[in-house]
UniProtKB/Swiss-Prot annotation:
One of its GO terms (molecular function) is zinc ion binding. Belongs to the zinc-containing alcohol dehydrogenase family. It catalyses: xylitol + NAD(+) = D-xylulose + NADH + H(+). It is an enzyme of class 1 (oxidoreductase). It comes from Morganella morganii (Proteus morganii). The keyword Lyase does not apply. The keyword Zinc applies. Its EC number is 1.1.1.9. The lineage of its organism: Bacteria, Pseudomonadati, Pseudomonadota, Gammaproteobacteria, Enterobacterales. Binds 1 zinc ion per subunit. SMART domains: PKS_ER. This is D-xylulose reductase.
Amino acid sequence: MIMKALVLEKAGKIAIQDWQSNEVLGDDDVEIKIHTVGICGSDVHYYQHGRIGPFVVDEPMVLGHEASGVITAAGKNVKHLKVGDRVCMEPGIPDLQSPQSRAGIYNLDPAVRFWATPPIDGCLRESVIHPAAFTFKLPDNVSFAQGAMVEPLAIGMQSATKAGIKPGDIGLVIGAGTIGIITQSALAGGCSDVIICDVFDEKLKVAEKYQGLHAVNSKDQQALADKVRELTGGEGVNVLFECSGAKPVIASISDHIAPGGTAVLVGMPIDPAPLDIVAAQAKEVTFKTILRYANMYPRTIRLLSSGKLNVAPLLSATYKFKDSVEAYERAAEPVRLM
């Protein structure tokens, strides 16, 4: 089947093209007409650099992995979904027989096929065929745009869960880009206050719209240190989420953490990053790392439906599919949230 798709040909070059899909509807699959696709930081990384760490774009690849749409066909074994249902899709398809999947950590399955992670094509196209087990019905009060945001929110949920947040904890989020959505998950997880820092005031203005968030421009490191001291009585934050992937930040990640605190590494540096091990040892910092999520979509959808996760301020613009190239060019500007 030939359809229109947004294809990354190589670093810096994308175009809408006729694309051949070889997907076949299986008994346990659904076919989905794509309605809304978000632009993630990883999409922009691939667009700009053609790689993230070991994941290298060696041949043309369809972009996009944050999506929602409408079911247009369902396999004979699918009982919980039907044609016409509004849905969002978890973009990773693991081997359900792998040791990791059987242990409930299917996000770590080495054989997982994840949309828009080389060499797997993404979902910025007219339709997809996807396992029904990784397709989730949207409540009536959750829009298509919110449905597309479930994917990055799920990363926040995974991060907040692994951080082991306790009621009343103080959190610090470094990096106010799309993945900085984690701040909402930290608040929902029990943090009484969350400091969020970035070097772009435009991003911080978005963060300021959320109650309980304290936005600080980290160009002024003294201002950041003062805010941490003010909220923690000089102890340091209980949990820190590193969402920037910036090597200088990772090197000094222990500076603002309380003794015995936790650092969650969420952002992905393009290249290996140094870390001050001794500084971390001196505080016995616990490090947690995040690779996507597992079993977080149902929880995230419930929180969206309840109104406890508000993504409206994070939706900066909406583009028609025919304007996808322009949308990516805009998203590649350093101050944009999409």
